């Protein structure tokens, strides 16, 4: 015995499919304009608990202790200018920074310890020692690992280098 099926018109399905495709295209375009995925492939990560980050290109407003992606500048030969880096913002304009071989203090609070990379860089630990006040549009970035290549080695990052706020995914 044959079951009779009523033939359904294809036009309503085509309209729904077109609307769905347009919505997906708009949402996809918005996401591609606003967000990037950052993946830390280093063996020794400066932020040890996370490998993948969502970077919000439209959120560049600096907030202390936030994670930010920024473009490197003047770090050759280790990194080409424009290399995207990701660190924790630990110093804002007006903050007092003191760097010694033992630790880095921002307004008297320790944000990093030691100079684990000084020997690899071929520079004496004491060469990085300094005290400074962060100027307008200058930000201090730190990694959480002792081996993080961060502001203690290369100084402050300018506001225009900041790419966007980063959120850890996994």
What are the residue ranges of the model-derived segments?
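Solvent-exposed loop/turn segments at secondary-structure junctions
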Residues: 60, 97, 104, 147-148
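Short, exposed beta-strand/loop patches in secreted or surface proteins that constitute
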Residues: 44-45, 89, 96-97, 131-132
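Protein maturation boundaries and topogenic segments
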Residues: 1-84, 133, 152-170
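Mid-length scaffold segments of soluble, non-membrane domains
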Residues: 80-111
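PP2C/PPM family metal-dependent serine/threonine protein phosphatase catalytic domain
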Residues: 107-126
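Extracellular/periplasmic metallocenter environments
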Residues: 128-129, 134-156
